[in-house]
Amino acid sequence: MSSKTRMYSSSSPSRRSFLTSVATLGAVSTLAPGFLKAQAANGLVNVAYCGIGNRGEQVIKSMQATGLANVVALCDTDMGAPHTKEVLGLFPGAARFQDFRRMFDKMGRRIDAVVVSTPDFSHFPIAMLAMSQGKHVYCEKPMGQSFRQIELMMQAEHKYKVAAQMGNQGHSDANYHQFKAWVDAGIIRNVTRITAFMNNSRRWHGMKVSGRLPKQAVPPSLDWESWLATAAEHDYNVGYVNGEWRSWFDFGNGALGDWGAHIFDTAHEFLELGLPNEVVPVVIDGHSPYIFPQASTLAFRFPARGSRPPVELTWYDGQRNLPPLPPEFAAPVADPNIPPPSRGSADAKVLPPGKVIYADGLTFQGGTHGSTLKIIPESKALDLAGKLPMVPSSTSNHFENFLLACQGEERCRSSFAVAGPLCQVMALGVIAQRLNTTLAFDSTTRKIANHKVANELLAGAPPRKGWEQYYKL
């Protein structure tokens, strides 16, 4: 398509158009005998990017750096705003859209994969429509806004046989391969306790609100109706957009949803933690029904799994809510590959995000993303130096892994089947923060047994009129 591309905006496609599109393209995946592979004629994966500014810009550059992706479409609800201009300049020939529904209507057959870097609450409808049409999906973390959305996304990955990767990039780096090798070799065994922490400043620190923000005029570049997607109706306010959505229970998932997937993801997968049977808000400082607390300590209690003992994972956020650390804890080193915060502070005086894992006879200190574990104290590390297993190098980074999975050459390391339960753990934590109450979760019935309102929050907010269909794909 030429640089004089048409931009579609505002008016949503008809329900008939939507359902016809899903029925026609979705049938391809149900008829396919196995996994759907991208079939780009030039050997590249034809990619549509949803969310092209802020974090989206970083994801696009990393995806394109693999040399495996061909950009066919760009979609952003605030197309032409300052934060979108660099990407627009990099790909002048790509089709442009403000509404992902129009993008699928007009270009669905040209798209192999969709990359979703929009705010947390709008991941779900884009990913569900893409998967229902047999498109592979790369979705930034966390996968969805609610426990139910995440459940449906896992089901869709399986139903439509697509490659689906969540964007916790460390899941393809050294920490991933080391953690797996050390568990397989019995170096990490019988873990009973994990401390995870993220104590940098966040957007909502210092905020005081008594309700929703007042109505402001919608900027001419922004399609507010499409930005809201399935979320409940809100009047526009600049305090909701460009990262500010992270502060609000209605739109974001707080420090836990933002960072948990980078800190305890490998522990969750390789220790097979699954879902907790109890979540206890030990500390909630500055509780609000609208924005995330100024600090929180949450205890997630996971039951025994076969021969593995129960595990208590304790999460700490808030600038002054520092975790108790073992005396041997070494000076942490922040992973240089972590993207800088778009707002807030990564103050070097504050404890960098990380974790401590207490296992049978050994204690492990770790950071975030791809940073590797170290055994503490150093004397024990020296004793074990010759007994540690070889750790394989990664065959691909997280973006290459996804695109190779689209082509049937690798499996997604953070597939929705793997990342989904991790995100559901965090979704339960967000409910505990929101209500400031202990949750008793029954993994068999997948319900919260002790609190009616909390149980209702598993489903999330009801979708706005006209957006119900994404829950039926």
Regions flagged by a language model, labelled:
Residues 78, 117-122, 143-145, 150, ...:
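Short, solvent-exposed turn/loop segments enriched in Gly/Ser/Thr/Pro and often Arg
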Residues 58-62, 83-87, 124-129, 149-150, ...:
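Short, solvent-exposed loop/turn and secondary-structure capping segments
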Residues 178, 190, 195-201, 205-417, ...:
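Contiguous beta-strand/loop segments that form the cofactor/metal-binding neighborhood of enzyme cores
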Residues 46-50, 71-75, 115-116, 138-139, ...:
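Structural recognition of the beta-strand scaffold that forms the well-ordered cores
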Residues 54, 58, 86, 99-102, ...:
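Extracytoplasmic/secreted proteins, especially bacterial periplasmic and envelope-associated proteins
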Residues 136-138, 144-221, 226:
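A contiguous active-site-proximal alpha/beta segment in oxidoreductase catalytic domains
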Residues 2-139, 151-163, 471:
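N-terminal glycine-/serine-/threonine-rich beta1-alpha1-beta2 phosphate-ribose binding loop
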